[in-house]
Amino acid sequence: MKFLLLFFLPLCLLGQTDTPAKEVDWLKNYDSAMHISKEENKNVLVYFTGSDWCPPCKMLKRDLFDTDEFYELSKNYVLLYIDIPRNRDLLSTEQWEHNQGLFKKLNKKGVFPLLTVLSPKGKVVNEYSGYGMTGEISYHLKFLEKNK
């Protein structure tokens, strides 16, 4: 009997899977995001990341952006993803130039990760920079709740 239990228990555990959070749609073009923002009267959440070199950015994706809480809050925003990778081959030349322009315009301190909230008129409403990589996302969630 113990043998059967020891045999079947690992099989049962293999069958368990975490249900991933629903994916959100990040736009990659500022003009498109602003157009939708005006149409839907929603603020734009701009996320500046260094996807291939920034450890806090990678952790923030896992700890915040891949959660059900973020999925629900994201419905209040138009989402704009601005990647500044070290490997420029990850982006087209056009996307690289677009992202660099927004980086210079909206991320003047050059910090990563950075969340910037823009009004439908394109004005900066608020910013939140950094991530302590501890799994603590309550400050980010409060920021998103406050600025929707």
PLM-predicted stretches and their roles:
Residues 1-19:
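Bacterial Sec-dependent N-terminal signal peptides
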Residues 24-27, 70-97:
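Thiol-based oxidoreductase modules, predominantly thioredoxin-like and allied folds used
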Residues 26-44:
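A short beta-strand-turn-helix
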Residues 38-39, 72-74, 107-111:
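Extracellular/periplasmic catalytic domains that process cell-envelope and extracellular macromolecules
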Residues 40-54, 79:
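Short active-site neighborhood of thiol/selenol oxidoreductases, capturing the structured segment around
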Residues 48-50, 82-85, 120, 129-131:
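Active-site-proximal beta-strand/loop segments in catalytic clefts of secreted hydrolases
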Residues 56-73:
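Typically the conserved alpha-helix immediately C-terminal to a functionally engaged Cys/Sec
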Residues 63-64, 104-148:
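Non-catalytic, surface beta->alpha helical segment in thiol-disulfide oxidoreductase systems
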